[in-house]
Amino acid sequence: MSDSIYAPHNKHKLEAARAADAAADDAATVSALVEPTDSTAQASHAAEQTIDAHQQAGDVEPERCHPHLTRPLLYLSGVDATMTDKELAGLVFDQVLPVRLKIDRTVGEGQTASGTVEFQTLDKAEKAYATVRPPIQLRINQDASIREPHPSAKPRLVKQLPPTSDDAFVYDLFRPFGPLRRAQCLLTNPAGIHTGFKGMAVLEFYSEQDAQRAESEMHCSEVGGKSISVAIDTATRKVSAAAAEFRPSAAAFVPAGSMSPSAPSFDPYPAGSRSVSTGSAASIYATSGAAPTHDTRNGAQKGARVPLQYSSQASTYVDPCNLFIKNLDPNMESNDLFDTFKRFGHIVSARVMRDDNGKSREFGFVSFTTPDEAQQALQAMDNAKLGTKKIIVRLHEPKTMRQEKLAARYNAANADNSDMSSNSPPTEARKADKRQSRSYFKAGVPSDASGLVDEEQLRSLSTVVRNELLSGEFTRRIPKVSSVTEAQLDDVVGELLSLKLADAVEALNNPISLIQRISDAREQLAQKSASTLTAPSPAPLSAEHPAMLGIQAQRSVSSASSTGEGGASVKERERLLKAVISVTESGAPVEDITDMIASLPKKDRALALFNPEFLKQKVDEAKDILDITDESGEDLSPPRASSGSAPVPLSVQTPASAIFKDASNGQSSISPGAAEAYTLSTLAALPAAEIVRLANSQSSSGLPLPKADPATVKATDDFIDSLQGKAAHDQKQKLGDQLFKKIRTFGVKGAPKLTIHLLDSEDLRALAHLMNSYEDVLKEKVQHKVAAGLNK
């Protein structure tokens, strides 16, 4: 065990320290000299001036002794065994020199060293106890099983401190009001994101009376040219409260309701150096003279994570590096848990879980670097007495796996009962089990600090766990953004799980992408369903009336390239008729509408039966065509087949490339007469392509439309042209990102659904022109969709 003294360049203090050390240990030697930084000296001078002013005014009573610290010696733990005494003194104890360090570094690889640190005076020991931060741990009691004294006062938040402030400055400023358990500058916001020093600090007095006096006297005082504020800290500071629970160089692990850590950890030691960035002057690790060292731990800790392993004993997947500890003493804190388990290896994190009121939930988690360390701790500590209780230690089973195991047991019991009382088909039972299982599925996917799904964390999981998490997340989100029924939910989720991980993450982070992926999944399922339908031989039908193609011209991009197939069978037509009746008002020409929908390609017919939104869209289009027929006096509907025969299909299709045709060059067979007067509302009821055609016609002067800016028109056309050759989904995705933002500015609910409906029912180029050049018409069209309930 090494024994070294470190002191500043101060001759009389150094001689006094040497004399004291000689009396205690003749073998003590002086190995290094460390000076306080200039900024620290300036801050300390400002604190002394403030304290002197209050003392002269009679505001501050003489300093009282620490209620628990009786000698200038503290027990030290959490020291990197590769760190020298000189580095430890310069980085951690530079504000309280001289110190005598006795560190036992004869520990296993990856384990931390411990020992004692002795100070010249009791005041310096008290200051170090209140200001030293993790991973270094200071204790008054040598026995780690004895709980450290806990302050009874509520924490105080200090704001508007000078930018040169550090922990030592804050301590010196407030110590005259009473003994402090903690005096540290805040380097993170309440959400746990590292922000650096922003002029705030947190104080913990042992006595509430001392805290109230400090708040009363120091609030609005001038410190370093700034007026500070002092008040009770009411914020829940995840990182600050848990700072002592995490090693700064380790990745955070918080197995709570969500698998994402509540506070990302950061490494205050950049590669090759033990000091933090010079911009973080508030950190106690900031020093101008720290020598760089080689940190052998970082490389191992930042490597690949250990995947979940299957435990035959538990019949589930477990995390081999993480321990679940229950039946904890209610008074046990995270520091106590860390100190208890640190002898078994390198601890990544140790946390006692608490409720919203800060009360212990009597269980916690300890995460080790390797499975061997965790296994050793499990064998040694299971059923061991810790505090007043015997603890139970188990390998951590992720919440997802635990709930799925319970669901499997529950469903197995239900299956046994149903076998005796029901003769339902096995496939239906399996689907029911699958849905029931999801009722237990509450775990969330890993997310980053901004709340977005973290692709890298998902990628680090095993395929089984990753798919389970994605399945649960899709199951929760799909009903919120789409009209997928309970019967369809499992199949749609199954299709989404077949996506690439990057595409799945994009869908979860982007509601527009999610709705589009759901639409694609339903279409793919409809194709599979349609392949099982039996269709009669197709019969030709000449397209004498181009207006008949109107129902095809409004088709989704994804279905625009379908080829003509056989018409609907009698049984299928009956299903279509029932579906049409369910979405039309009383008195509507349901037979004619059904005939027109029955003439669609097999793929679209199946989609109409499967997707209520798609069916309603096609019904509306069919009604528009029938209305035009009534006005012209011509019968443009396909001939209805006699009973027992199938309707005759259309043989002419709209090519997919037509969506990129400039709407200004196209001619609409359903356009109203040129002499007709338009209002904004009647214009919005027209297809986007027709609106753009009218806006570009010679008679556009009478329309309630502004003149389009040529530069905007060209930019829009260039954007649409850039999408040519891309997949239909990508085309909609690119335009949808812009359209969604525009619709959201209208202040309507259900913007994602409205966006998808417009993308599926309108010509993309024309829709882009409405968005960029005719915003008023687009807004009116959106209001029409809202009135029709298409945003629900």
From Swiss-Prot:
It is found in: Cytoplasm, Cytoskeleton; Endosome. GO terms for biological process: mRNA transport. It comes from Mycosarcoma maydis. The RRM1, RRM3 and PABC domains are important for RNA_binding and polar growth. RRM3 recognizes the specific binding motif UAUG of cargo mRNAs. This is RNA-binding protein RRM4. The gene is RRM4. PROSITE patterns: RRM (PS50102). The lineage of its organism: Eukaryota, Fungi, Dikarya, Basidiomycota, Ustilaginomycotina. GO terms for cellular component: cytoplasmic stress granule; cytoskeleton; cytosol; endosome; nucleus; ribonucleoprotein complex. Residues 412-424 have a biased composition (Low complexity). Keywords: Cytoplasm, Cytoskeleton, Endosome, mRNA transport, Repeat, RNA-binding, Transport. The keyword RNA-binding applies. Part of large ribonucleoprotein complexes (mRNPs) containing RNA-binding proteins RRM4 and PAB1, endosome-binding protein UPA1, core scaffold protein UPA2 and associated factor GRP1. Interacts (via PABC domain) with UPA1 (via PAM2 domain). It holds the Pfam family MLLE.
